[in-house]
């Protein structure tokens, strides 16, 4: 009785419904509440009758979305069961398609929804995810099929489904993506377009994840082959065809395209694809236009001076340490040339990874005064692993402070060996570096930054040091308000204590010690900001493919990368001449009107004057000795000093 009553109520409700508009724009606001981007609403669809739809489009759509559309009713129980089975099998074989041997693709999860259900969701239902909404979907689908023929419903689907890039309906999609009429599209183009409604923003081959779009295209082709609509040769040829995309879209004029793309990705992850595509959202972001401008200008200006060193690109990210909010995100210098956001792409960090290695050491009872050997060492392996310092020289026994400040390679590998690769990886994960493959087979070279990580993760790790061991959650969205004025998302404050404040301060003390780093970097490098306390570290890979500078003040953490998107090598570009000048310019620019703040020193540290040559206590309380910081109970005592001196008597 209840079921019948519910059906009648929703069926009556359906009679008075009008299709919702998918043309409402989303508005992006910066941290000051000013609009910096509006995603233009989709233009009304250019309608096409089912008689004028090319057979290729019909075959591709039915094969990939609902192959039994003309045989089943509004709901397809067999399709739901089949989808559940496929999803189960995919989970068992890690996403490999039954056509993976043909196309080397990953299978898309099956939803089980019929074309009628998809149409209902697109034009009649809200974005809420609830049991009530699912019941409405079923009732509306039955009512739609009761009033319309299958051809009418299929025609409505093709004309009203959203394909991304402000294209409502497949005719508009054809023009926006390829600049062609629908009947002019090739198999390669059709198979790309018909797969887009599954996730229009993410799968857009123009502004989304192109690799994901290609995988979706391969899925469409595999389904067409499975349904015997095309041959294997046709499928393979279409998959290998280079698409001539019509990139002259509204996106070309976006002011901060990399940031906008990243915000959209975050929105899809947090709210779902439908919520964003339906429009009408007011998205309040963390972007500071002033800081973004400083970052862009510094990177563009400096890279222009490095052309003779084969440098074409730079990326940078600025994080507010107090809030974890991203104030600037520069994913590259030219969005029209490359839409790859380098701040979220994996690259080798080189020596900028060493603070993570030494943090692992501090977590395992080593100290800033622990001595490590800096000399020619064969660490074994085939071929033998014999790391060298950048300048080719060696300095004998050095303290951890000296080794890290001067970015000496051999001691970093030695520390990696002492604590173990696994503990280094766990420390990286602790600090927020999730992009490093925890299941990868890394050797001791991980201590020199041979593993690939993202700039965003590295900024998070360094910000953890700045926050005395509280790891921030980098965010680009503060809140989202929907078309009805309801706040549907509010970014929670999220800092997590992951590191002893004393260990964080010891690391900051080393990275901000300009006197200690003078041996390699000199006393007046671009890693200092006058009398403003700042901690910094450079990184350059052996092949000169990546050049980094990471650093922080109490207020901001800034990470900069310089290199080439295609991983081609730069011409012998040292760390201080690559990313560091950009980092210095950004740091100076964003702190120009800020008061000087010292790094907060936590309680409980032991302080002992230490000789940098012996790593032991000294009665001489001045340079070159250093006032070293220790966790309680880890400082060397005077007896160790006397034992050391006796050997010279």
Placement of each model-derived feature along the sequence:
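Conserved catalytic neighborhood of penicillin-recognizing serine enzymes
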Residues: 89-129, 183, 249-255, 366-424, ...
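N-terminal type II signal-anchor transmembrane helix
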Residues: 1-29, 68
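Glycine-rich, acidic and aromatic/proline-enriched surface loops and short helix-turn segments
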Residues: 121, 125, 159-166, 183, ...
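A penicillin-recognizing enzyme superfamily signal
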Residues: 285-308, 318-320, 329, 334-345, ...
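Residue-level preference for non-acidic, small/hydrophobic
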Residues: 33, 61, 119, 153, ...
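Non-catalytic, structured segments within soluble enzyme domains
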Residues: 107-293, 297, 426-429, 433-438, ...
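Flexible, acidic/glycine-enriched loop-and-adjacent beta/alpha segments
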Residues: 49-115, 169-171, 380
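Short pre-catalytic segments that frame enzyme active sites
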Residues: 34-46, 172-176, 196-197, 201-206, ...
């Amino acid at each position: 009785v209840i079921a019948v009553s519910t059906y009648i109520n929703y069926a009556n409700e359906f009679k008075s419904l009008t299709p919702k508009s998918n043309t409402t724009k989303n508005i992006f606001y910066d941290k000051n509440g000013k609009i910096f981007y509006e995603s233009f609403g989709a233009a009304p669809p250019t309608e096409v009758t089912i008689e004028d739809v090319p057979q290729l489009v019909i075959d591709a759509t039915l094969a990939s979305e609902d192959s039994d559309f003309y045989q089943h009713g509004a709901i397809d129980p067999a399709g739901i069961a089949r989808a559940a089975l496929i999803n189960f099998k995919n989970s068992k074989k890690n996403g490999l398609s039954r056509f993976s041997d043909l196309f080397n693709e990953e299978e898309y999860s099956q939803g089980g929804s019929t074309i009628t259900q998809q149409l209902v969701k697109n034009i009649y239902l809200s974005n809420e995810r609830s049991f009530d909404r699912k019941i409405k979907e079923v009732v509306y689908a039955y009512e739609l099929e009761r009033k319309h023929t299958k051809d009418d419903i299929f025609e409505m689907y093709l004309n009203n489904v959203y394909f991304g890039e402000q294209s409502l309906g497949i005719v508009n999609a054809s023009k926006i993506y390829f600049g062609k009429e629908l009947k002019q599209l090739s198999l390669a183009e059709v198979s790309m377009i018909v797969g887009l409604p599954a996730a229009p923003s993410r799968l857009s081959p123009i502004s989304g994840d192109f690799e994901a779009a290609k995988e979706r295209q391969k899925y469409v082709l595999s389904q067409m082959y499975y349904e015997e609509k095309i041959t294997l040769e046709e499928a393979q040829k279409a998959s290998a065809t280079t698409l001539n995309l019509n990139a002259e879209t509204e996106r070309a004029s976006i002011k901060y395209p990399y940031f906008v793309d990243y915000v959209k990705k975050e929105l899809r992850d947090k709210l779902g694809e439908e919520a964003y595509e339906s429009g009408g959202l007011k998205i309040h972001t963390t972007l500071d236009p002033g800081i973004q401008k400083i970052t862009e200008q510094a990177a563009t200006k400096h890279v222009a001076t490095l052309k003779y060193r084969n440098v074409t690109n730079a990326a940078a990210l600025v994080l507010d340490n107090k809030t974890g909010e991203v104030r600037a995100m520069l994913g590259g210098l030219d969005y029209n040339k490359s839409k790859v956001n380098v701040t979220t792409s994996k690259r080798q960090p080189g020596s900028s990874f060493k603070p993570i290695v030494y943090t692992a050491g501090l977590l395992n009872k080593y100290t800033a005064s622990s001595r490590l050997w800096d000399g020619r060492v064969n660490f074994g392996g085939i071929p033998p692993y014999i790391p060298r310092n950048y300048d080719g020289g060696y300095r004998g026994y050095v303290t951890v402070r000296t080794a890290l400040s001067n970015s000496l390679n051999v001691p970093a590998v030695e520390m990696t060996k002492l604590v173990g690769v696994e503990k280094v990886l766990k420390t990286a994960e602790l600090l927020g570096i999730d992009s490093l493959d925890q299941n990868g087979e890394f050797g001791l070279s991980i201590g020199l930054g041979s593993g690939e990580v993202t700039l965003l993760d590295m900024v998070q790790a360094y910000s953890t040091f700045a926050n005395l061991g509280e790891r921030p959650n980098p965010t680009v969205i503060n809140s989202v308000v929907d078309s009805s004025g309801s706040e549907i998302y509010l970014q929670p404050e999220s800092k997590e204590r992951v590191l002893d404040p004393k260990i964080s301060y010891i690391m900051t003390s080393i990275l901000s010690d300009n006197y200690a780093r003078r041996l390699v970097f000199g006393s007046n490098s671009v890693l200092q900001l006058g009398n403003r306390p700042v901690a910094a570290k450079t990184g350059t890979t052996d092949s000169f493919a990546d050049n980094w500078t990471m650093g922080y003040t109490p207020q901001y953490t800034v990470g900069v990368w310089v290199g080439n998107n295609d991983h081609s090598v730069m011409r012998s570009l040292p760390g201080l001449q690559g990313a560091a000048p950009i980092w210095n310019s950004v740091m100076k620019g964003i702190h120009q009107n800020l008061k000087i703040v010292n790094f907060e020193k936590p309680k409980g540290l032991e302080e002992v004057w230490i000789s940098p040559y012996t790593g032991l206590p000294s009665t001489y309380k001045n340079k070159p000795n250093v006032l070293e910081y220790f966790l309680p109970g880890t400082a060397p005592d005077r007896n160790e000093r006397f034992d050391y001196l006796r050997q010279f008597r």
